[in-house]
């Protein structure tokens, strides 16, 4: 299965949360992993927030960023430019952010499923989201 992994799912692989195991399981079962280039910035920003709030030490966040970089090497990383127009249309139609809609547009484009831990996004696109 082709799987598009959004920033929320990638972040859960590094910063444990209640649905981290779900993300790990889906990633391990996928035949192809895809994401958008913007995911690196989104996840790095999430690590930064955790460090700023004292939930992670700065060295922990930096180490996680290095691990994230290695993980991205195993992904097929797509440019936002590939899906921007479709993402914008989906965002307007479904009332989600263009950021979130971009992952949906990528899943549609490659004929894959979307792994997201964003419940609102999953509810808006249940046919595309992997459980």
Curated annotation (Swiss-Prot):
Q: How is its activity regulated?
A: Inhibited by EDTA.
Q: Which Pfam family, any one of them, does this sequence belong to?
A: PIN
Descriptive protein name: Ribonuclease VapC3
Its keywords, alphabetically, are:
Hydrolase, Magnesium, Metal-binding, Nuclease, Toxin-antitoxin system
GO molecular function terms noted in the UniProt entry: magnesium ion binding; RNA nuclease activity
Q: Which organism is it from?
A: Pyrobaculum aerophilum (strain ATCC 51768 / DSM 7523 / JCM 9630 / CIP 104966 / NBRC 100827 / IM2)
| Reported function | Toxic component of a type II toxin-antitoxin (TA) system. Has ribonuclease activity.
Which cofactors does the annotated protein need, by name?
Answer: Mg(2+)
Superkingdom assignment: Archaea
Enzyme Commission designation: 3.1.-.-
List the SUPFAM superfamilies. Answer: PIN domain-like
Binding sites annotated in the UniProt record for Mg(2+): 6, 100, 118
Could you say which enzyme class this protein belongs to?
A: hydrolase
Question: Is DNA-binding one of the keywords UniProt gives this record?
Answer: no
Which InterPro entries does this one have? PIN-like_dom_sf, PIN_dom, PIN_Pae0151-like, TypeII_TA_RNase_PINc/VapC, VapC_family
Can you state the subunit structure given in the record?
Answer: Homodimer. Forms a complex with putative antitoxin VapB3, possibly VapB(2)-VapC(2).
State if Coiled coil is listed as a keyword: no
Q: Which gene encodes it?
A: vapC3
What are the PINc domain coordinates in residue numbering?
A: 4-121
Family assignment from sequence similarity:
Belongs to the PINc/VapC protein family.
